Amino acid sequence: MIASLQYFDKIKEIPQFSHLAADSAFMRELNTVNDNVSASKLCNLYASFGGNRHDTDSCVVFFTLLPGNNDVIKYDEDWVNNIVDLSPQISRCLSAINASGYSEYWSSEIKPVLDGYINSYPVSEKAINAIHDAMTEFSGPEILPPTRSNIYILNIDNAFNLSDESFCCTPLLLDVELEKKFRLDFLKVYIHENLHRLSISEQLMQKLDELMTDDFYRDNENVARGHNEGRNEAFVVAAEVFISHKIGRRDNCSVYNEFKEYVDGSLVLAPIIYIHLPEKQKAESLNDFILRLFDNGTIKAGNVKAEYRKAMMKVETSMLQTEI
């Protein structure tokens, strides 16, 4: 139901919700919420502070009482404070959707569809175990918990990870035909989102800021940010591609295409990091490894374009050798 705020267009023509779409006061508050916070952040806050994920009434109460929730207030981070400031609008919108029968609508119309996707998706215990073993090994001293993250299939069009290690995902990624058509892979997305749990230091983020003096990096970074990506996304992409290739979920052609096509090929640090990941030491975190690439001059302002071309040439050569 929380995600329905961002995806209200999916339900606005359904009879029990159509009156809300015609309510100017409701739509004004809904637009205020959606202009200032994403569904993923709302879900993350709710999950982080013990919200009941199976009861819509509890959800409404949580956001209604949010300004007086001391556990939330003392957290004192910008994204949390932003949601607290918006809580009156959020609670009124959720209350209206809930009162219109969202729980019954979800049980009768949405859950059967999501269950169908889940039950028909082919995935083996062996594949899941291989993924978790590879991620645990890759995480080095951080040691990502070997226990599996909870996976929630929501009526949304994207995917995101919650801070409690839950993974929220669109059912479209479980459509085998769409996977084939658009070269998607639910399990690669699962790896990607879980890798966002790895810590990135302020020191490393500062080095990214300093890299904006490099024309080639800056031009591509601006493209990435235009897609709401960029920053440390290149780290995660490099790590996911490395792990997926290692466990056989990507071949050399898939590796090349990911770097050329993902976010219009703008994550130019990703292939640079990728080709050096075999040098990552077992007891070294991804953060410390990338810092080492900065410290030894592999990644530095004025040299990104040359290193990117070198990396892509190596990736392309591996792809062509495979095709021979």
Where are these regions (language model features)?
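N-terminal mature-domain "stem" immediately C-terminal to a signal peptide or N-terminal signal-anchor/transmembrane
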Residues: 1-69, 263-278, 283-286
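Active-site scaffold of zinc-dependent metalloenzymes
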Residues: 72-78, 132-133, 148-184
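An active-site-proximal "capping" alpha-helix that borders the catalytic cofactor pocket
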Residues: 131-138, 230-245
